[in-house]
């Protein structure tokens, strides 16, 4: 079978949104070429544990590659992807050039091409993200491994917003905590919470493909006794109280449910949010405070922030 490699040149801010659009369009694999990966802060903090080839990354911006089987409807699929990306600026998401190119690849090439972008990455004092096909031995008994198959995943666990959420969970999760993960994507935050000692994690996503991906990764990490995955829109119809809510979503989406979060999280409980570019920190903080939360800590990495807020 012949496959088409769709390459989109965009910004780091738009990576999650564009990746989601591509998965929604039926992509069978997505690879992200972000030159920031070459100089990640974690390399100074934890030591470089893999080598990347700078020649494979764009000089500026981010290149997202997605793989689609060649069909009679491919042209319409690409047009739909472009239309969806063109709408993102109306949500204050900078898309950069948004240029789209198409190349033909053989099945044997695409099946392994995107895997070269995923390697074991230690993202915190506790966790290392490991692709399922990689051999990796923990460096200490305390190191926790999260295995991910990013073939369908919405994020690989190494984006700054996901990294900060995991570090925030490390700071806050107590044994026996009950947790809700809103917009779970690959399930990585739910898996981390389970491995940190949570007794119950409810993971929700509106996208059925994300739900399938999260379920697979939860089983892969043997955390399905703690984590339940379901399809749901944000916190609609969800009852509390729970000890903690975590949501790694675009700022525009977070603004839709601070009041629901305050309703579901117990008094004194926590709401961890990320997916927030630095320029939108103030508007998110104000919305959380208006809903009754107190900002306890703000984590920063590159141009992104994560907020830890406590309910009244």
From Swiss-Prot:
Coiled coil: none annotated. It holds the Pfam family PrmA. GO terms for molecular function: protein-lysine N-methyltransferase activity. It comes from the Bacteria. It is found in: Cytoplasm. The keyword S-adenosyl-L-methionine applies. Transmembrane segments: none annotated. One of its GO terms (cellular component) is cytoplasm. Belongs to the methyltransferase superfamily. PrmA family. This is Ribosomal protein L11 methyltransferase.
